[in-house]
């Protein structure tokens, strides 16, 4: 207490209150992490029967943000097929297929694999499949390439009919998922702590939305990461909370773990500046962050796409909003209802572990292919 006696009454009171606040924050965070770790330890890992298949997997060749998806799919395939070979779009895919004679050539994303190459691979007798992981944003391109594959898997529910109209007969909805080697509950330093966190690029739809909530967010401990946020009209209000940079998946997970609330706001499928979707295919399905936020054990507040109830229970495993006003209202509510917030986050984590890993998705893909052989 010697230090406290040297302070004036106001300083002493501030120091005591600060210590209490820090203790409360640390205790609260530790309790949440402990409960999350119990959920993870009690989860029964998904195990799928290995398929008697030889597979040649062609990565996206796109770098971030697609390379982590490549890695997660490959790791899941390693557990579930008899033989796996991996190549990039820069490799001679026709030559490799001729040499290896895989039963399946699985192309991820496929922007750098020409239709001529796909046709040549098919002529060699291998079954071809593509998993489009960023539909409907590249529909102007994918509508021309999909017909050349034997099987088409898409992350976007609305694209099933879209590809069928292009002449594809075997089209399946296959959502993305979480890589549990990256996104999971973990202890992080206090520098990662926040009341509210948002990670994502400043597409114009997001810019307009954040302009409306910026005055409110400026009063909170907020962290925002991503490209182009200087476009905000309200940038001056939030500049000290914004880092205009792309975060690695590992860093993203740390900020999710340190946040009380993580906002998810989907990009618009109609943004002509960035999209190649001139036919204006709707976006009904949830983005990868939906799974990653829940997989981190964080509390998610998301705008609700039509397919969300098929993946998570709104109000049970995460929370939703439909306007800027409702988002502010729910941020306030859940910041002041910690137990309810943490309960939803835990249930979201449980659901993710049970249903939404890349092991689950690859098992579905392989089951479709084996059943139709």
Predicted regions and their residues:
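Conserved catalytic-core segment of nucleotide-activated headgroup transferases in glycan assembly
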Residues: 188-261, 267, 271-274
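Acidic, amphipathic alpha-helical patches
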Residues: 93, 117, 142, 249-252, ...
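Extended catalytic core of nucleotide-activated donor transferases of GT-like folds
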Residues: 36-169, 180-184
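Carbohydrate-associated surface elements
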Residues: 177
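Catalytic binding pocket for nucleotide-activated donors in carbohydrate/polymer assembly enzymes
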Residues: 49-61, 68-88, 253, 257-373
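Active-site regions of enzymes building and remodeling cell-envelope glycoconjugates
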Residues: 83, 149-150, 168-172, 234-247, ...
């Amino acid at each position: 207490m010697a230090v406290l006696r040297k302070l004036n009454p106001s300083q002493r009171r501030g120091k005591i209150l600060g210590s209490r606040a820090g203790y409360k924050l640390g205790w609260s965070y530790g309790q949440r992490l402990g409960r999350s770790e119990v959920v993870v330890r009690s989860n029964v890992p998904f195990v799928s029967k290995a398929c008697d298949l030889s597979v040649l997997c062609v990565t996206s060749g796109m770098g971030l943000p697609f390379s982590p998806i490549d890695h997660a799919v490959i790791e899941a395939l390693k557990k579930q097929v008899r033989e796996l070979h991996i190549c990039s779009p820069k490799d001679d895919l026709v030559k490799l297929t001729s040499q290896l004679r895989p039963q399946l050539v699985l192309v991820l994303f496929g922007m750098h694999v020409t239709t001529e190459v796909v046709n040549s691979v098919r002529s060699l007798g291998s079954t071809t499949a593509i998993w489009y992981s960023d539909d409907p944003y590249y529909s102007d391109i994918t509508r021309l390439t999909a017909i050349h594959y034997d099987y088409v898997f898409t992350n976007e529910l609305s694209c099933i009919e879209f590809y069928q109209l292009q002449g594809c007969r075997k089209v399946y909805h296959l959502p993305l998922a979480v890589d549990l080697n990256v996104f999971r509950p973990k202890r992080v330093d206090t520098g990662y702590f926040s009341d509210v966190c948002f990670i994502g690029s400043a597409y114009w739809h997001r810019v307009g939305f954040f302009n409306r909530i910026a005055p409110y967010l400026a009063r909170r401990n907020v962290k925002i990461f991503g490209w182009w946020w200087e476009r905000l009209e309200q940038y001056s209000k939030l500049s000290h909370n914004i880092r205009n940079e792309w975060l690695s998946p590992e860093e993203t997970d740390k900020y999710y773990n340190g946040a009380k609330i993580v906002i998810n706001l989907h990009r618009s499928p109609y943004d002509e500046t960035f999209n190649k979707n001139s036919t204006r295919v709707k976006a009904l399905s949830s983005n990868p962050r939906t799974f990653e936020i829940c997989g981190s054990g964080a509390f998610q507040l998301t705008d609700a796409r039509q397919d969300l109830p098929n993946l998570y229970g709104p109000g049970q495993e995460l929370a939703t909003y439909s306007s800027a006003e409702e988002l502010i209202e729910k941020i306030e509510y859940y910041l002041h209802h910690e137990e309810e917030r943490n309960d939803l986050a835990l249930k979201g984590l449980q659901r993710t572990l049970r249903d939404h890993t890349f092991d689950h998705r690859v098992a579905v893909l392989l089951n479709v292919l084996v059943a139709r052989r």
